[in-house]
Curated annotation (Swiss-Prot):
InterPro entries: UreD
Source superkingdom: Bacteria
Family indicated by similarity: Belongs to the UreD family.
Name of protein: Urease accessory protein UreD
Subunit structure: UreD, UreF and UreG form a complex that acts as a GTP-hydrolysis-dependent molecular chaperone, activating the urease apoprotein by helping to assemble the nickel containing metallocenter of UreC. The UreE protein probably delivers the nickel.
Signal sequence bounds: none
Gene Ontology cellular-component annotations: cytoplasm
Keywords for the protein's UniProt record, in alphabetical order: Chaperone, Cytoplasm, Nickel insertion
Function in brief: Required for maturation of urease via the functional incorporation of the urease nickel metallocenter.
GO molecular function, one term: nickel cation binding
PANTHER family xrefs: UREASE ACCESSORY PROTEIN D
Subcellular location: Cytoplasm
Length: 280
């Protein structure tokens, strides 16, 4: 039985902000700023890998994002700090009469490392989801970033027949542009099924990592099984970009995690230790 979606026509808009900053103190990364307004929180910081890597779980208690809602994240890492940020479950963008927005600002000082590893966003038919991410790297700062988006509810047979999804990603190192993209997907658009678009796959995922890998590891990454379509490219300027199209979010997630397992030791010098929250 498929549960009815909540009627959010008269939902009062939430405007939420979360500001996080991390600093290196000796051999440990410590959270030094944690400010929030509205329904955005972080759970207690964890050190599953030891004191060097500070893990935070980002929580949005309402559980869904409706028309007029806005979420703003500001994440800053000082020199040599290392943070890993993830989420406990999917972000749900509900159908709405007006746009819902999320902005993410990331600033990394030299020697800092950020792993931004949230779970998927589900964009329901009729939603108007607009996301903007701006990332500034300084010096030799390191980044491992991914996002996953499911359009409609494929498991329930719901296609993304109306609404829109807009996402912009801008990455710079010392103010020099490394990567910029902007995509807009309209509900019912022919690109959803076109072979030059999503080719009928309702789930799309992107991974961007700073650094370079050798040809052998690149081929091992490309050979990973993918229950959909996935590939990885090494770009000039020291960026790796991976794409995946899949029929279910769990397939895209599994592929990203396997890429992370292969790439993390080479790029970040540590074996991959999946956060426990991914198993709950």
């Amino acid at each position: 039985m498929t549960a009815a979606l909540p009627d959010l026509s008269f939902h009062p808009a939430w405007h939420a902000q979360l500001e996080l900053a991390y600093a290196r103190a000796g051999d440990a990364t410590r959270p030094v700023t944690r400010r929030h307004a509205g329904p955005l929180r972080v759970q207690k910081h964890l050190y599953a890998e030891g004191p060097e890597v500070c893990q935070h779980i980002l929580v949005h208690p309402p559980g869904g994002i409706a028309g007029g809602d806005s979420l703003a994240f500001d994440v800053r890492l000082g020199e040599r700090a290392w943070a890993q940020l993830t989420s406990p479950g999917a972000a749900k963008w509900y159908r709405a009469a007006c746009p819902s927005r999320q902005t993410l600002e990331i600033h990394l000082e030299p020697g800092a490392t950020l792993e931004w590893l949230p779970q998927e966003s589900i964009v329901f038919a009729g939603a108007q989801a607009e996301l903007e991410t701006r990332i500034q790297l300084r010096g030799d700062a390191r980044l491992f970033y991914w996002d996953m988006v499911a359009l409609g509810r494929p498991a329930s047979g719901e296609r993304f027949a109306s609404g829109h999804f807009v996402a912009a990603l801008d990455i710079r190192r010392d103010d020099r542009l490394l990567w910029h993209e902007r995509q807009r997907i309209d509900g019912g658009d022919r690109l959803l099924d076109s072979p030059i678009g999503l080719a009928g796959h309702p789930v799309l995922a992107t991974l961007v990592a700073s650094g370079e890998i050798d040809t052998d590891l690149l081929q091992r990454c490309r050979a990973l099984p993918c229950a959909g379509r996935g590939n990885l490219s090494q770009l000039p300027g020291g960026l790796l970009v991976a794409r995946c199209l899949a029929d279910e979010a769990l397939h895209a997630r599994a592929w990203l995690i396997e890429l992370w397992r292969l790439l993390r030791p080479a790029l970040l010098g540590r074996e991959a230790v999946p956060p426990r929250i991914w198993s709950t």
